[in-house]
């Protein structure tokens, strides 16, 4: 386990420091994990913050955190008013050379905490409405030529406020920023997630990679996690009799193994999903937006 010196910077400016619960992080807490997560309260701003620390000094342990720092720096600079993404407060190295970063801690919980195998029209409407909002967040991100790459039910946070979904996207350790990575900066894509687009890691990520993951998350919210154990997502969607034909076509187009056959952008996917929602639940989307 990572040991921290609460009397040394940056921890001397924090209080109530504790490990982040696995239900909120989705990260392993074992000693061999590449980094550890803490929550704390900043003494200066009185805001809650998330602290990430590499478990050991060295390039192997800090590559993902360095990548997250760089991507969040671009996002915060170019989208200063966006509420979808974390704000990077501070980053640097501890006295023992381990890299750290401090960012905003959101109140929302991972979508994974809302997933159930029980299906109802009410839950389907809520899940689709949530994904429409996630699509809006990804439109902002992709406008910067940054792709998240590792979207899954733990990396998308959400809650409902006054009948509308509030969405956050976190964990940019595997993100791909074209301005950096297409020009020689080392990139190490994730390799284990069932939500990962199949063309990775052999090809560079693009918007269609995130689209695959987003549709896989939506199907998981609708049907539960069983498909992640039994088969690939396209096969499961195709065989699922409880998915409406129009929605099934949207999902299958999004998770096609060939990225050339997917929607070309999240904008196109979101438009198709919005049209389906409005035909299925007329007026609901406009009422929620008012």
Predicted features along the sequence, with ranges:
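ATP-binding glycine-rich loop module of kinase domains
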Residues: 34-68
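Short beta-strand micro-motifs within the conserved protein kinase catalytic domain, predominantly
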Residues: 87-99
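Conserved short submotifs of the Hanks-type protein kinase catalytic core
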Residues: 96-110
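Activation segment signature within eukaryotic-like protein kinase domains
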Residues: 130-131
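Catalytic-loop of the protein kinase fold
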Residues: 142-160
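Conserved activation segment of eukaryotic-like protein kinases, specifically the C-terminal portion
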Residues: 184-199
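Conserved HRD-motif arginine in the catalytic loop of eukaryotic-like protein kinases
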Residues: 262
